[in-house]
Amino acid sequence: NTAFNSIAVIDADGTVLGKYRKTHIPDGMPYAEKFFFTPGDTGFQVWKTKYATIGIGICWDQWFPEAARCMALKGAEILLYPTAIGSEPVLLKDSKPHWQRCMQGHAAANIMPVIASNRIGKEVQGDSEMTFYGSSFIADETGEIVAEADRKTPGVITAEFDLDAIAKTRREWGVFRDRRPEMY
């Protein structure tokens, strides 16, 4: 039996569009997920929904810029990252700003909004404890955070984007036009 960390992609009308299986599985403490999950085999994909073409990475995938760029090249208009991140026992400081800046960079580099959801609360297993810091956020195509939830309470955040205007800006910047993949 193989277990994957997966997400089902369901459109606004309830149509199941597909699934994505998490590509990057962390192995270090406290996220020793390789004991439980197999790295995904779906590759990064995009789905055309009623509202936008979306790309989805799960948690640890967000730390890999290649994932965001791959989905952007496949036509994503918005990137989504459902996440479970919190206090890092191996770090002596709060990782929340680094976590947010990483995805703000994906938004700015790919000139598209990024939506990152994160859980809240505390999980205790034996002597180990982890507090998830919430702070779900939405960044616009420049990477600016335009909506953010707090660290401790459940919440819903929203933002509206003119995807046609963002696509025009993306073309004008020429980031995708001027790529040189033969040099990478």
Regions found by a protein language model. Name each.
Residues 1-78, 82-105, 172-173:
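Active-site catalytic loop in hydrolytic enzyme cores
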Residues 161-164:
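Acidic, His/Gly-rich catalytic cores of divalent-metal-dependent hydrolytic chemistry
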Residues 59-157:
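CN hydrolase (nitrilase-like) catalytic-core segments centered on the catalytic cysteine
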Residues 166-184:
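A conserved C-terminal secondary-structure "cap"
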Residues 15-17, 144-146, 167:
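Short helix-loop capping/hinge motifs at secondary-structure junctions, enriched
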Residues 6-9, 19, 44-46, 116, ...:
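Conserved hydrophobic/aromatic beta-strand scaffold that supports enzyme active sites
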